[in-house]
Amino acid sequence: MLNHPASARWGKHFQFRQAQKMNTPDKRYNDYSSYLKEVFPDFKVQKISINAGFTCPNRDGKISHGGCTFCNNQTFNPEYCQPTNSIRQQRDEGVLFFKKYEGQKYLAYFQAYSNTYAPNEILQARYEEALAHPNVVGIVIGTRPDCINEPLLDYLGNLAKERYVMVEYGVESTLDRTLLNINRGHSFDVSRKAICQTAEKGINTCAHLILGLPQESREEILDHADKISQLPLTSIKLHQLQLIRGTQMAKEYDEHPERFQFYTADEYIDLAIDFIERINPSFVIERFVSQSPQEFRILPNWGLKNYEFTAKLEKRLQERETRQGRLFEKR
């Protein structure tokens, strides 16, 4: 277990809990920035990406060689975040890259590929290498729900008593039909079980969903909100379907464009609002959109920065006089 002099000082902040219902007339959903301020009231916190050099069972042949049809990991690796660099080097360069405020702290974000897909002793060594910096206060681990095991969850549960820990699962859809079509390699039930097991260990848990996957109707998309809202999540991350160059999905679009629905920015804003109306009001919403670099992205092309999109969405929430969880039903 990590032994760091700051652990005792910071540990009290990081105990797992679902966020309280924080949305107000001015902020009609539980935004990530407010959540971080609640968890870390004494300093600003920034994520720094880490590429630990892991792969994915959907690429190395354990499940498949093709990977998910939408996936190109190059689209979210910062320049400093290269697997040829050590964890320490990536961490230190990320700290320098994002340093803006006196006393700023950081979360090491293991983002590329499946960051629980290795022997546990290797995983623990790499997590702890990232944490071995006086200004790194926690880790966020992106992974697949079929790449988790009980001993690792025990380790992370103990670590979460000392540092902030979030496990972010790529759920993508709650429809097994869709998961099969995008070559995800697991069912929604696997996601559900992994989320429940992780939360039971006292670990903050996030679900990542793509809105608008091929051949999903609007009502099926909104049903994702109903299903995911019954799970013990801390947060969710949403983004629009993006068609990325070099992916199997791009090839599918060329051959069967009728399977796809790409929304305009205004259409997606209304879809996202319909979605969060049905989302558990205790969940934090980390984001609504993601923008892959233009050189990779085929569609959609909205010409909006993420903050511009969010401002438009917040304005639309006010116009519709609605908020997160307005139509939520606990089952």
Give the role of each language-model region.
Residues 15-37, 41-46, 235, 243-331:
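Auxiliary Fe-S-binding modules of radical SAM enzymes
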Residues 98-99, 127-134, 156-164, 196-200:
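Acidic (Asp/Glu)-rich catalytic clusters
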Residues 189-249, 266-289:
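Conserved C-terminal portion of the radical SAM core fold
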Residues 74-91, 98-120, 135-148, 164-190, ...:
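Core AdoMet radical
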Residues 46-50, 106-108, 139-141, 165-169, ...:
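Hydrophobic faces of well-ordered beta-strands that scaffold small-molecule active sites
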Residues 120-128, 149-158, 182, 221:
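Distinct, well-ordered alpha-helical segments
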